[in-house]
Amino acid sequence: LLAEIDAWTRALDPRVVQVSVSLAGSHREVDIIRPDGAVFSDVRPLVRLNVSVTLEENGRRESASAGAGGRAAYDEWIQPGRWQDLVRRALGKASVNLQSIPTPAGVMEVVLGPGWPAVLLHEAVGHGLEGDFNRKGTSVYAGRIGEQVAAKGVTVIDDGSIEARRGSLSFDDEGTPTQRTVLIEDGILKGYMQDRLNARLMGVAPTGN
């Protein structure tokens, strides 16, 4: 399969000078036994396919990649339609990079698209919305439920119940079913992500994240 993707990519664009393709997967069977005697079992497959390309044009080389995956079996991601879409996306981004110019220095507004920019949201905001930090008062969001903590129009949701996505789970590692948890809505802080211990200590329900 990887050799087929490599050959198809090179045939699609004569500027291709390098192709790197990876397919990785894992299969976990999870059993959780809580002190209250509740037992939970789950199967958690995880697959990711990634395509990286390097183009050369007029002596200039630029690279780009595209990847996708989720909680599904390998056959979901080895379909030609799946990997061909990733190849085209990687080639498209590399083509744009060939036309890029140096970014000017200074402070400016930027637009972040979907995908990896969400990691910035996860690190800068997500960890601060975890229940233990807020119970202990060490988060900048502690005690601020109902206050405006972001610009209007900003809504942050944790949802582990979306089917077959990389972060999807039937339940968390304590057996709490995952759900759609609105953390920030239109800039207003609505709640925190809670495990069983901190939910009990704060008098709220666990959120299954």
Map each language-model feature to its residues.
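C-terminal, non-catalytic macromolecule-binding modules
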Residues: 185-209
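Active-site bordering "gate/hinge" segments
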Residues: 1-180, 185-188
